Structures are given as structure tokens and as C-alpha cells.
């Protein structure tokens, strides 16, 4: 067990206590096949080193660990929404990396419509008995479309019955909305992580089964 205390990067009046407990490792090859849809915020607020550039580097790490039986998709949202990468086998790493390299920040944040599109993409690539998960990567600054907390949570909660979970990955500071990220993950039967460095946490969350 390892503990660490540090100031919260989004509020210097708050402290974070990190408790790390090492459990039994489960070989990646033993995990069910994964259908991962990364819903990436590419709005203007993500255009800083600790946001989109860090996210892209983390995604490349994940792509390198994907197996041929795994599928990865990229959905982006800013003023509008786009499927930047259709469901692609983990064996096609160059194709995945090229799509990641093409991500650019700019525009406002239509997060709700992005969530809807991500669920459609996840359903199309659904793997029965596999890990079917949307990973929402954002600084939490939703400012276009459905912006009411309850509406967003209800939207995600309605979709969890489809067997597709939603986890959230928080990046950066400033407009970062920790409360919304935690509540969306809870509603989506997923987990929440704050990513401030190139850590394994993002990889573990993507590869884990269930919460």
C-alpha cells in the first residue's frame, strides 16, 4: 500500500489523497476482447499541453497495447461531432495512430451530442461477452446542447442498459468540472480518473472489466 498527498491541480485549497493498493495482476491476453470508443473533446478549451496533447500521447500508448481481437473507435466533438476513426482492429496500429495524430482542438463544446454519437458507434461494434466501453476524455467544459447535470446523467443512465459502460477521463484545469465527470461515470456504470501525467491509470481503466 502506498499513499501520497498533493494539492488538487484545479483548486489549490483542496488536497488529494492517493492510495495505491497493488492487487493480483491479470494478464492482458486473458481479458475478454474490448470494444473501446474514445469520445474526445477537441473544443478550444482543450488546446493546452496538459489536455489534448497529453490525451493523444496516452491514446498512442493504449493503441500499442491493443490486441488483434480488440476494437478502438474515435469520436470527436467540439461545435459538432465526427467519427474520426470507425471501429478498427488493434492489429491496425498505424491506422489508429494516424487518426490520433489528426486530432486538433477548436470550437465550442457540444458534449451531449457527442455522447449520443459515441453510443451509436459502440452499439455498431458491440462485442457480446466483451468489454464494451465509452471513455469520455474532456476538461468537462460542456457549453453547447444539453448542459444541465441531471439531463446529462439521465441520458447516460438510459444507455447503460445496453451493456455499454461509460467512464470519464478528466484533463487539465481551469473550466475542469470534477463533479460532472464523477456523476457521469457513476450513471454510466463506469469509473472516473483525473489524468495529469502520462500514467498507467488510463490504460488500466480501458482494459478493466466492469468498474
For the regions a protein language model found, what residue spans apply to each?
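Conserved P-loop/Walker A NTP-binding site and adjacent catalytic elements of P-loop NTPases
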Residues: 2
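Exposed acidic/Ser/Thr-rich ligand/metal-binding surfaces
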Residues: 6-211
Amino acid at each position: 500500500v502506498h499513499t501520497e498527498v498533493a494539492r488538487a491541480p484545479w483548486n489549490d485549497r483542496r488536497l488529494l489523497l492517493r492510495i495505491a493498493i497493488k492487487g493480483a495482476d491479470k494478464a492482458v491476453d486473458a481479458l475478454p476482447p474490448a470494444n473501446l470508443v474514445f469520445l474526445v473533446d477537441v473544443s478550444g478549451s482543450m488546446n493546452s499541453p496538459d489536455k489534448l496533447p497529453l490525451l493523444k500521447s496516452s491514446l498512442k500508448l493504449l493503441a500499442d497495447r491493443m490486441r488483434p481481437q480488440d476494437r478502438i473507435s474515435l469520436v470527436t466533438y467540439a461545435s459538432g461531432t465526427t467519427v474520426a476513426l470507425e471501429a478498427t482492429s488493434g492489429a491496425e496500429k498505424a491506422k489508429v495512430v494516424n487518426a490520433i495524430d489528426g486530432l486538433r482542438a477548436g470550437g465550442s463544446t457540444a458534449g451531449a451530442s457527442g455522447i449520443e454519437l459515441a453510443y451509436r458507434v459502440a452499439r455498431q461494434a458491440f462485442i457480446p461477452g466483451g468489454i464494451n466501453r465509452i471513455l469520455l476524455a474532456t476538461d468537462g467544459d460542456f457549453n453547447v446542447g444539453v448542459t444541465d447535470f441531471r439531463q446529462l446523467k439521465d441520458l447516460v443512465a438510459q444507455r447503460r442498459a445496453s451493456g455499454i459502460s461509460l467512464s470519464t477521463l478528466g484533463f487539465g484545469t481551469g473550466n475542469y468540472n470534477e463533479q460532472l465527470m464523477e456523476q457521469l461515470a457513476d450513471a454510466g456504470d463506469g469509473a472516473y480518473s483525473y489524468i495529469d501525467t502520462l500514467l498507467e491509470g488510463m490504460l488500466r481503466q480501458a482494459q478493466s472489466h466492469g468498474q
